[in-house]
């Protein structure tokens, strides 16, 4: 499966929500996900309102969150969440709260399989299952300066994390103008998300700009992306398979 996540679709799907604690947010789905098929990936931008709190919770699927705007904190860590911080939480792993700063905080949530929704702690603690718990967070992955990016003579791929034995990995790829990069999936990963953080990339003639993305299942990898008149930069988030403990 290969899906393109576009801003046009996200804007058409934009809807406001509110949690039980009063936290308000906008949700922008980048592509359509079936509510009836667990094998449907999810990718959506959350715009969390200023000075609001997304309470501690867990999900039943592995997920990445890519923070894209604003500032906040997560859990007990004093480290600020800024663009472009990557946070990974495994299935049935509690995390949070996510506390938004005075300008709010935005983040893209990505899953290879559909999740029915957050399970809040302590209210839904009885739904937690026994098994491995895992989370990981990067430093802010700053885009390359425009002059340095324009001076590149060939694509440059930097490993940010992994690959781990279960397939968890994060890469940062920079492409000069008129270049091509065959993005390969990490061994053992079930899928990867390719997110544009600077410039424009193309996939089979479809142009993808900032925050637009590609979902690529392992069976459809590798994925060729190109640039034309200007350089670009992407993050590649490799999703581990569900742990057998939660099968």
Language-model features, listed with the residues they occupy:
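A short, N-terminal "cap"/entry segment at the start of jelly-roll beta-barrel domains
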Residues: 1-38, 118-169
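Contiguous mid-protein beta-loop-alpha structural module that forms a pocket-lining wall or clamp
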Residues: 73-81, 85-121
